Each structure stands twice: as structure tokens, then as C-alpha cells.
Swiss-Prot record:
Reported function: May function as monooxygenase and play a role in the metabolism of aromatic compounds.
An annotated GO cellular component: cytosol
Class of enzymatic activity (EC top level): oxidoreductase
Gene Ontology MF terms in the entry: oxidoreductase activity; protein homodimerization activity
Gene name linked to the record: ydhR
Pfam families xrefs: ydhR
Keyword Oxidoreductase attached: yes
Name under which the protein is recorded: Putative monooxygenase YdhR
Record-linked InterPro entries: Dimeric_a/b-barrel, YdhR
Subunit structure: Homodimer.
Record keyword Nucleotide-binding present: no
Gene3D superfamilies assigned to the protein according to its UniProt record, in alphabetical order: 3.30.70.100
Amino acid sequence: MATLLQLHFAFNGPFGDAMAEQLKPLAESINQEPGFLWKVWTESEKNHEAGGIYLFTDEKSALAYLEKHTARLKNLGVEEVVAKVFDVNEPLSQINQAKLA
């Protein structure tokens, strides 16, 4: 079953195009993660937060990525990562044009 991972954390920038340029190598590497399907990058310069919404093929892959990414962020000085993991209701999501693959 597809699994959604939602996370956010305190982030002081850069934001926007500068963030995209600086984090492009990270974005490209995420594509290689086992079970990874897609990510929507999120940011709020106003609230000094960043994060993302990820879709994985299964919960095991989502949790493995969460563990890896949380450790990476902590090494960069991020003190707290707020994460939630959800099962995806695929029949209802498809009615609303969700891209699940």
C-alpha cells in the first residue's frame, strides 16, 4: 500500500530559487531512494520552516527514508523533525486524480 510521509522542521533558508539551486543535488539523490515515488517540497520563509510531502510504495521504505533523512538533518544542526506517516486510501485518492505511481 502506498505510504505518505509528511515532515517539516525549522529552517533559516535559503528559500525559493536559492534553495532550489543549493539543494538540487539532494533532490536528485532522493530519486534513488528505495520505494520513492515523488516529493513535493514545502517551504515557508515567513515561518522559517521547510519540509516535504513524500510518497513511497510502502511503509517500510518511508520509515527507512525518514530515519536516514532525520539523521542527515540532525548532522546539519536541525534539532527537531516533525514527521507523520499515513496510509493512502488509493480508491478515494484516484477519484480525485492523485498520482500514486
